[in-house]
Amino acid sequence: MRDDAIVAEAAEYAVKFHELGKLAEAEKFYAAILAARPDHFDALHQLGVLRRQQGNSAEALRLIGEALKSNARAADSARSFAATLETLGRYEEAIAAFDKAAAIRKQRSEALFSRAIALVTMGRQQEALAAFDEVLAIDEHNIEAHINRGVMLTQLGRAEEALAALDMALEHEPDHLSALSSRVFALAKLQRHAEVLDACEKVLARNPGNAEILYIRAGTFWTLDKPAEALDSYEQAWALGHTRALSLLALYRLTLADWTSTDQLVAALRRGIADKDSIYPFVAVAFGLAPSEQLQAARTFLGNGSQAAPASRHGALAGSDKLRIAYVSSDFRQHAVAHAIIDLLERHDRSRFEIIGVSLCPDDGSAIRARIVNSFDRFHDVCSETDADAASLMSELGVQVAVDLNGPTQGCRPGIFAHRAAPVQVAYLGYPATTGADFIDYILADPVVLPFDQQPFFSEQIVHLPDCYHANDTTRLVSPETPTRRDLGLPERGFVFCCFNKSYKISAPVFDVWMRLLARVDDSVLWLFKMHELAQSNLGREAQARGIDPRRLIFAPYAARIEDHLARHRAADLFLDTLPYNAHSTAIDALWAGLPVVTCAGNTFAGRVGASALEAAGLPELVTSSLEDYEALASKLAAEPALLESARRKLAAGRRTCALFDTDRLRRHVEAAYTTMWELQRSGERPRSFQVEPRQ
């Protein structure tokens, strides 16, 4: 093999076999060349490429590195070396190597593009965006750079600019599928729903099996109040293996009181969770799946573990001896969480705590938003910030305890907490289950909703407050003007069972109980909160199938003022809770308005909030442990007016003294919990479960 002609011929054969995908044959020729010429540049480079194709990136890096020793200006080798570093997860080195490759003019654009992709992989979005700009400054016709720039801009919340970038790509290639698909996501961010549907059709005409686009189309149909079309698109996406589509198909059928396929959908959800498919954790909670399944769903949703980023450097406390608490939420707007938390925020002890608000949602102009903003010592809107930048801001502010009021719900930003926004991170109020995140240290709960024996199913350490964990606004007024039953569309005589829960909380087994109660109690009606007309129609049909006139189901319209909504509870006789997902704020509203609630305690956090609220309200006798007992108790209260009146009087007498409505007491317990968490952190102890002792 020392003859140059023989080496050249061997190289020719090696390249041909390599191009044909016959890697074993190509490898033999490369090896033979290197046996004769150990520093043969092309053989070193190509064998390195071959090793990378085989998945042996470490050996590929060694071989390509050897090739570069003999020709450091080889553009292909420089790019391959950088790309191999990226494959090995050595991103910082890869970026430096791409910079070297970019310095070789022959492939400057390609190297800069690869560098930008590496920055995307690292989550360094702003730098990636700048890198794509560099590529386009050299090659304005680089379609992939336009598309990737559009994707980055969409992720950064700059969807209008993203559309412009994607339209540039489509000017060069009108049928480019990736550009058309990316355009769907930008339009969806802008909530330009009609255009989203048009864009989806363009993609699906070229690629009818695009499950993600079917999923986006389904969500848009749902937003536009076209449930039949939405469910059909979710079905199509699920058939293509899109498990998040399964999640929403199941949830929205439940929302529409369509129970025809509940058993099959629940079985599919369980299979998906067991197979570690991406099932929305909230859906597992809504269907009352086992705590172990809720944990697995949450972990998978986050990516089979938290993927926590390295801890941020936390800012100095600027000489303050106050504990700095940051509440983080996408619900600082017209939302149940905002109404529940506001009284606690306003009452925090400012002599010992500095309270900071971090909003993940824009200002909706509501009165509660203004009140929320004013309740904080400092308030920051980070809607347009990246997760890393939001976490850095909190670190610079010296936040010691960060409280996640979302969990995996709409608008959540777990990436902020994954970047360790604070040394101590806590889940509270917004999500009645585990987040599944190893970067959330604690969950605030109570002994009823979350006994310590549930710790194996929670990634967070459980912290017990002495009473009901749920915060409430005890400054709310109940209108003194009680509307008549006739005004409310209710019969003037007869017993009124009431449940103002959202429709997805109404399960078939509970509805069975309700219909038996209506059959047993003469002239009784069931007063529900207004829901989608299909849900109302389906419930009417289900009632008729159980022998109950659908006209005995009466639906209350939305009340513009909270005080009027609370006041109309006086027209009802008894609130019936739901299972497996209890009423939470809704049940507490009923109790605040003076309406007794009957609940059945379930097997999950979400199914035990009613029990916790009733115990804290001093009415443990209204808590049952089975649907049979729940039905019997509701029936007895309806049949014995004196017994029901006794419960009503007891509720009224304790309204200002019971633990449920003592926000100062809750505040002292929550502050004690934060203090203990911080003391454990300062002492170097790992987070551990503990119980807060009662404080008067």
Predicted ranges, named:
Residues M1-P491, K502, D512, R541-G547, ...:
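Alpha-helical solenoid repeat scaffolds of the TPR/TPR-like class and their adjacent stem/linker regions
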Residues L323-Y327, F497, L526:
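Conserved hydrophobic helix-helix packing surfaces used for dimerization/oligomerization
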Residues R352-I356, M515-Q544, R551:
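A conserved nucleotide-sugar
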Residues V496-P509:
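Substrate-binding clefts and catalytic carboxylate motifs of secreted carbohydrate-active enzymes
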Residues T578-P580:
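A short structural motif in glycosyltransferase catalytic domains
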